[in-house]
């Protein structure tokens, strides 16, 4: 009797397939078997690319004579620690009574690669191969995936992109790490007084290092600029509110060189002068020049993809992206949430049609039981497909991370943090079935003489989705916030994580901006509603508020993941930015691991309490070496464009050979440029400039510095190179 063979990526996933298939047969060594089915598993990767010395022993010794290393055919080998399981899977693949193979590895590029390597190494089994593609591990979804499984050949382009990604990382890592180590490793080790220093380089890893080092140097080079704002205290029916002066057209200071932006002065004396000029008119009064009232909606945020979830968990729980991925992977394997390694923040049309089941299951989840019941009773889910939360065009492999509504008993077996991560996912999900929060926005312009003062108020009228957004473990904080809302009538950020993608640009200078929306109690709100143009109000006082510009913020582990996801926005070339606008560096499956590796090899340091990321001295030195030799590796343009190329291969837009030709040309050209270069004479000055910032750190060891100032160390430095390396 012919049997079907199901190959999962992990033993735990294989168990779920066995349950769904009702396999009650014997458990054997490395697989489960019934009368008509066999279920086995990999343990992640069973096969890997061989080291260069497996091609020829001469490659074991690092030498410029053997670079660039560009094999015509790539060699692979079984990973020694999993040899036994590989032999089991190989034997099952070639069993005579197996006629159909169901590939059940993770539904994505890496899962595809895991199986293809095993099949390649196992030899010609000549069976029918079907690909199971699922979004969760619920029994219903597993059976749907098996019923709708396509021929494996439908995923050949995805497989090609997976092989190319591995070859790309392999060739860049081996060639660039070896050539840079051979040329400049001694410069680094001699400076640090260490015995030997390999220079580790990677397509994505080095780009991330560049982002962190550049940000740190921007912070060091930043010089705070003081500025002085002029504020009016305006009386209205026994209440007071502020107006902020701005040098708009008609002001005596309009476009003068004394200004810092339009709402402040560079020097305090000019702010004092303005006040004296305005105080000439007594009694001090202002006229309502303009008043605007409008309602403003704040929509529920988009659903979680992995990057957004990692960012939020970094803020809420102070855990690293790697920890978040482990937690959400565990929740996925326990059937609690959908597939975690996704870049999408929306649902598919097909998923939206079945979303009732997810909501219905959440009626059994204590924290959202009433919410889920309300959504079902009101039928809020019925028009979901027409909202911005459903968009098939924004989905590649998988839709957003949402709760399945199943497996709730498994919550007892996970950590407290995992339980809270789950609730965070659930809250984000149920929010999309609620209306927007509604605010009353009041904008007011008053004039004293010809000088304009601006006031802005934002009042919460209807909580909308905010009423269900607050996590239960944050109740006290939320209650305090809501109490404040009820007293002041002003909306806070009650329980809602706003989308805050750090694109890596110099943001965060709140002090530079105009005054934020002001608090407004019930009496003041009523008075403002009655105001009209031409009304004259009393001004109690004029004052000066001093501020200063803020440096860029350091990345934390969450904002770093978002910066990697949004790295396309960092590209200055408008045409290139448009081409790869949605393509970041790395993938949702690899970003956390890359960040972890940079910390493990001591190029970056992660503060576990704050999750703030900073470079180490070694990391800055490696940055300087790469910046002077293969600068392209530090730039998002290169990394994101390679990633876009892999997507083109997966889509069938370009061929595997076209991509490979470009890759080999790049590796060959850059390797030879480094071989021909000589930047040692310039590296010392860069190392010195970085080291001065670590003079109190054990990192520096006994390395000598030039004693340059911190600001000098932070200044942009140009690496001059001999013509041979151009």
Predicted regions and their residues:
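Basic, low-complexity terminal or inter-domain segments flanking catalytic cores
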Residues: 2-5, 28, 82, 93, ...
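Metal- or metallocofactor-binding catalytic centers and their adjacent structured scaffolds
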Residues: 255-302, 310
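Short active-site loop/helix that positions an aromatic residue
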Residues: 14-22, 116-117, 209-219, 427
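C-terminal accessory/connector segments of nucleic-acid motor ATPases
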Residues: 222-245, 284-321, 327, 336
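Conserved short loop/turn motifs at secondary-structure junctions
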Residues: 2-3, 104-107, 196-198, 293-302, ...
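C-terminal or mid-to-C-terminal helical accessory/interaction module adjacent to the motor/catalytic core
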Residues: 74, 87, 96, 137-234, ...
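Intrinsically disordered, low-complexity regulatory segments
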Residues: 1-178, 265, 474, 495, ...
């Amino acid at each position: 009797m012919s049997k079907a063979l199901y190959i999962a990526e992990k033993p735990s996933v294989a168990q779920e397939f066995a349950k769904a298939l009702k396999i009650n047969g014997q458990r054997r060594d490395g697989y489960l078997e019934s009368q008509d089915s066999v279920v086995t598993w990999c343990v992640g990767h069973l096969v890997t690319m061989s080291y260069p010395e497996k091609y020829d022993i001469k490659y074991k010794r690092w030498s410029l004579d053997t670079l660039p290393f560009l094999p015509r055919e790539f060699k692979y080998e079984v990973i020694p620690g999993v040899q036994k399981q590989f032999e089991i899977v190989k034997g099952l693949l070639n069993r005579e009574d197996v006629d159909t193979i169901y590939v059940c590895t993770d539904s994505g590029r890496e899962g595809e690669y895991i199986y293809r390597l095993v099949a390649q190494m196992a030899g010609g089994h000549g069976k029918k191969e079907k690909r199971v593609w699922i979004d969760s591990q619920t029994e219903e979804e597993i059976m749907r995936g098996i019923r709708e499984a396509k021929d494996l050949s439908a995923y050949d382009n995805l497989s090609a992109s997976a092989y190319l990604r591995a070859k790309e990382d392999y060739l860049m890592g081996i060639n660039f790490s070896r050539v840079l180590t051979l040329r400049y490793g001694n410069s680094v080790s001699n400076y640090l007084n260490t015995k030997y220093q390999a220079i580790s380089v990677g397509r994505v890893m080095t780009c991330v290092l560049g982002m962190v080092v550049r940000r740190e140097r921007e912070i060091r080079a930043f010089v705070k600029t003081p500025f002085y704002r002029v504020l009016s205290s305006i009386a209205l029916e026994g209440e007071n509110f502020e107006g902020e002066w701005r040098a708009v057209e008609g002001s005596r200071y309009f476009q003068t060189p004394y200004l810092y932006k339009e709402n402040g002065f560079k020097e305090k004396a000019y702010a004092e002068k303005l006040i004296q000029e305005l105080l000439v008119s007594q009694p001090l009064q202002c006229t309502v020049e303009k008043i605007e009232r409008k309602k403003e909606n704040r929509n529920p945020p988009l659903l979680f993809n992995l990057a957004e979830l990692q960012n939020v968990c970094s803020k809420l729980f102070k855990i690293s992206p790697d920890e978040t991925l482990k937690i959400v992977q565990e929740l996925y394997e326990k059937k609690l949430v959908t597939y975690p390694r996704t870049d999408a923040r929306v649902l598919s049309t097909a998923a939206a049609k079945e979303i009732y089941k997810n909501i219905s299951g959440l009626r059994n989840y204590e924290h959202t039981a009433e919410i889920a019941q309300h959504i079902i009773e009101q039928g809020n889910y019925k028009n979901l497909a027409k909202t911005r939360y459903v968009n098939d065009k924004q989905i590649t492999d998988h839709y957003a991370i949402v709760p399945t509504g199943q497996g709730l008993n498994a919550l007892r077996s996970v950590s407290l943090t995992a339980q809270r991560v789950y609730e965070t996912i659930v809250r984000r999900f149920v929010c999309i079935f609620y209306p927007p929060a509604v605010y009353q926005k009041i904008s007011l312009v008053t004039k004293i003489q010809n000088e304009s003062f601006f006031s802005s108020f934002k009042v919460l009228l209807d909580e909308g989705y905010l009423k269900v957004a607050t996590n239960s473990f944050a109740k006290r904080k939320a209650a305090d916030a809501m109490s404040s809302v009820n007293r002041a009538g002003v909306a806070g950020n009650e329980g809602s994580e706003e989308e805050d993608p750090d694109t890596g640009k110099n943001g965060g200078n709140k002090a530079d901006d105009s005054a934020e929306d002001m608090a407004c109690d019930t009496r003041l709100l009523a008075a403002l509603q009655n105001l009209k143009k031409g009304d004259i109000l009393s001004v109690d006082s004029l004052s000066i508020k001093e501020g200063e510009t803020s440096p860029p913020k350091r990345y934390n582990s969450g904002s770093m993941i978002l910066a990697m996801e949004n790295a396309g926005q960092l590209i200055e070339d408008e045409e290139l930015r448009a081409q790869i606008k949605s393509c970041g560096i790395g993938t949702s499956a690899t970003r956390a691991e890359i960040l972890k590796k940079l910390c493990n090899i001591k190029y970056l340091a992660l503060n576990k309490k704050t999750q703030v990321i900073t470079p180490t001295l070694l990391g800055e030195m490696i940055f300087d070496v790469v910046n002077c030799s293969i600068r392209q590796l530090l730039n998002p343009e290169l990394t994101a464009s390679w990633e876009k190329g892999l997507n083109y291969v997966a889509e069938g837009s370009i061929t595997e050979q076209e991509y490979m030709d470009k890759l080999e040309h790049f590796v060959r050209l850059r390797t030879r440029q480094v071989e021909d270069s000589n930047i040692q004479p310039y590296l010392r000055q860069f190392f010195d400039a970085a080291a001065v910032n670590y003079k109190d750190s054990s990192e520096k060891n006994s390395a000598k510095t030039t004693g340059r100032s911190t600001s000098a160390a932070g200044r942009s430095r140009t690496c001059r190179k001999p013509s041979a390396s151009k």
